[in-house]
């Protein structure tokens, strides 16, 4: 199941249930809220507004953890990360709430589902 620019809703959970792989956008809420606050304080109201508005249509890592808990998913793979993590500390902000086995995708990553197998391979 592939989802993009959406919150985790009951319908997303329903559609994800039983999926081998769920690819979902993800937002590190604490980073976005921090950037929003700093933008507002520095007078950059346009950026602050954008950072506020994107919270309405990106799934938080806590909500994605709930998705993984409530739906039977083989692999939760996150893409379209907001904000795009540029270092290990930012990646850690995404990993904090995620269940074991969740994957933060990278450009060029391949997820393979071999025929006649339950195996999910990430390369």
Language-model segments: residues:
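Core dinuclear metal-dependent hydrolase active-site scaffold
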Residues: 1-17, 110-123
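Cap/insert and terminal regions of metallo-dependent hydrolase folds
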Residues: 7-108
